[in-house]
Amino acid sequence: MKIITWNCCLNLSKKFEEINRLNPDILIIQECEELPEDFFPNARYYWTGHTKNKGIGVVLFNNTAKVDESFNDKLDYFLPLNLDNGTKLLATWSFTHRAAGRFGEGHIGHVSEAIKYYKNWLEGSDKAIISGDFNNSVIWDKGNKDSNFGNTNAVLESMGFKSCYHKLNNEDFGTEECATLYHTKKRDKTYHIDYVFLKGLNPKSIEIGSYDDWIKLSDHVPVIVEI
């Protein structure tokens, strides 16, 4: 099974052909628009967002799913899906608390809060995936705040989740050789902030898209995991 996460930087409908060439089974897309069901004739599309042109979507090519009844639209943007094979998927597009505040009172956008909220649900299955644009790295950690990525990763590890990239490449968080974000599309402004965390599933390989192949489409490159 191939899992791909990618922040497409808007207009998925114009970029879908490119990402679809990678033949995903599960495609997690951030910053994408709401699309009609018939746009994906051979797949199922699940989406949530505040505006129709900017949200988080999941395209399933060989599975169906149901949005879990615990779904909380005040958590921006996190989509909990129960796949028909028993796997749980939390599609993720995380924001800082300050950025999430723009969505309105009571809205929370940080992944640390989403993990707290969905913890019982995630622990209800032996197999689970948390994947997407986390907008975070240990390089920005200060003090001992819950929102620090080091603390977030510690919570995930306590729940049995492992980052595919770090497991397969034997690299420490914050020292990643491969970037997933090229800020302002500059080749030298690199960050690793997109992740695939797995529990009860064994990754066979991981690939990070190249700057040259993807920079015309987005400031992010795809993260591609085979399990």
Please give the residue ranges for each predicted region:
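N-terminal, active-site-proximal structural segment of metallo-dependent hydrolase catalytic domains
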Residues: 1-41, 50-56
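Active-site metal-binding loops of divalent metal-dependent hydrolases
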Residues: 8, 32, 94, 133-134, ...
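Active-site environment of divalent metal-dependent phosphoester hydrolases
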Residues: 10-15, 33-37, 97-100, 137-139, ...
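Metal-dependent phosphoesterases centered on the DNase I-like endonuclease/exonuclease/phosphatase
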Residues: 26, 108-193
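Structured beta-strand-rich core segments of catalytic domains in phosphoester-bond hydrolases
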Residues: 30-99
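Conserved beta strand-loop-helix elements of the APE1-like EEP
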Residues: 51-67, 84, 182-204
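Active-site-proximal loop/helix segment associated with metal-binding centers of metalloenzymes
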Residues: 89-109, 146, 154
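Surface polyanion/phosphate-binding segment centered on an Asp-His-Pro turn
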Residues: 216-227
